[in-house]
Curated annotation (Swiss-Prot):
GO terms for molecular function: ubiquitin protein ligase activity. This is F-box and leucine-rich protein 22. The gene is Fbxl22. GO terms for biological process: proteasome-mediated ubiquitin-dependent protein catabolic process; protein ubiquitination. Substrate-recognition component of the SCF (SKP1-CUL1-F-box protein)-type E3 ubiquitin ligase complex. Promotes ubiquitination of sarcomeric proteins alpha-actinin-2 (ACTN2) and filamin-C (FLNC). It comes from Mus musculus (Mouse). It is found in: Cytoplasm, Myofibril, Sarcomere, Z line. Pathway: Protein modification; protein ubiquitination.
Amino acid sequence: MHITQLNRECLLCLFSFLDKDSRRSLSRTCSQLRDVFEDPTLWPLLHFHSLAELKKDNFRLSPALRSLSICWHSSRVQVCSIEDWLKSALQRSICSQHESLVNDFLLQVCNRCPNLTSVTLSGCGHVTDDCLARLLLSCPRLRTLRLENCARVTNRTLAAVAAHGRALQTLHVDFCRNVSAAGLLRLRAACPNLRLSAERSAAMIPDQPPRARVCAASAFSAAPGRQSMPHPTGSY
């Protein structure tokens, strides 16, 4: 029996066992298999392990998408996490090649995938509060949002969760240095039933513009009998 003699249900099952590249390669063999590749029901889950994968044409976005993860574990993540005003020309050049990729991709998700229920972003140092706020508005069924080592995420994302994350049940903002303890406490007060994790976030040093850094250092050195206060960590 030739593969094209299988019915649609069998072909979808067969495709479901293949990775994205293999699905794309098989779809190029004939129009029938290309139609299977284009079937939205084939794409309820999407997992990306590098930002380069976001630019490929080996997947499809549709209202059938339920779970999305973008996990970038690369040495370049450390470069992305450096404060913009501290980056060298070389580091800025490296970031310019990919800094808009995740935000642009998530905007496509907002437009095409309204039924999304779970999003995980790890090592996405350029994803912004505005982009996440739009995601929460565009995907009202979102139940789980996991953010890890996303340097540009701030208390504005927490405020967006409180305002727009009506279906959200679980939020992780782990190792996100610009999320503060005060912001987490406000979110906890606004959403007492939310399962909230902020591993190390409130204990990390947030970004400070050069002038704020100098002023803070001057005030600290001038303060008599200064004492260090412990930062809260873990779940809130």
